[in-house]
Curated annotation (Swiss-Prot):
Keyword set includes DNA damage: no
Protein's cellular compartments: Cell membrane
Function: Catalyzes the initial step of the lipid cycle reactions in the biosynthesis of the cell wall peptidoglycan: transfers peptidoglycan precursor phospho-MurNAc-pentapeptide from UDP-MurNAc-pentapeptide onto the lipid carrier undecaprenyl phosphate, yielding undecaprenyl-pyrophosphoryl-MurNAc-pentapeptide, known as lipid I.
Bilayer disposition of the protein: Multi-pass membrane protein
Protein name: Phospho-N-acetylmuramoyl-pentapeptide-transferase
EC class of the enzyme, as a word: transferase
Gene source species: Caldanaerobacter subterraneus subsp. tengcongensis (strain DSM 15242 / JCM 11007 / NBRC 100824 / MB4) (Thermoanaerobacter tengcongensis)
Amino acid sequence: MIQKIIFATLLSFTVAIISGRFFIPYLRKLKFGQKVREDGPKTHLKKSGTPTMGGIIFVVATFLTSLIFSPWNKYLFILLAGFLGYGLIGFADDFLKVYFKRSLGLRAREKLLAQFLLAIVISWFIKSNVGTEIIVPFFKRSVDLANFYIPFAVFIIVGTVNSVNLTDGLDGLAAGVSTIVMAFFAMIALFLNDVTYGVFSASLTGGLLGFLRYNKHPAEVFMGDTGSLAIGGAVATVALLTKLPLILPVLGIIYVAEAISVILQVFSFKLFGKRIFKMSPLHHHFELSGWKEEKVVYSFWLVTLIALFVSFYSLS
């Protein structure tokens, strides 16, 4: 099994590296450039026009590698449904942005409706195939959610998808953090002796590493919602299948911090007319506090790496 995981990581990495060399110039030719928000950090305005929808690079690499090395079973179908399904929602959003040359694609209501409907379907399949028990980290026990499982799973999926999306705001940030997160699940799959979960997680890990070659600062391409929503769908789905959704607040501490910073900022401004952060999500607060973009990114990677070890400890 470990050989399959290693080969899956290497193949997906290679596919992402090679495909990126051809796909990024093609995106430039199509003029699929990202329109940067004018109300964001001024240092980001120079990034306007950078090709977006680059998430296709690691989505395709992960999909092909998973088909090659993983058994074709219902669990792979569920993983790919979460991964590709949310990737398609993101693709639709990205396409509308670049086609109409605007910073917003799908309406928020449309995007959320699609996310919730897909989450309900995926949650039902997970419940039907792995049951309703989840593991509680640090306490070495499991809890049966019974009839509360589907609402809980829907919350986990939609919450994770949007949290990853919020994290994707700096060069290499979401890709690097998510590489570490998916590497964790690849290692968990080794302990579970589950080839399907292991190959899929390793494939996405390798694909993201290859994508980082082009997404690190200064980024040649952005993953767009195509990539960030696909990652969120993958992270949430594999966490639920392995019965480890409660590990996400620890392992995905950066995702959680980014999302909470936005929620707190909105509530504080609406209730008190004051902002807690200089700008949200959290990574922009650090930028406006004088941190260089690379320092923010590397610091968030380091926090996630520490969170990985804490997550393993919580399950030991």
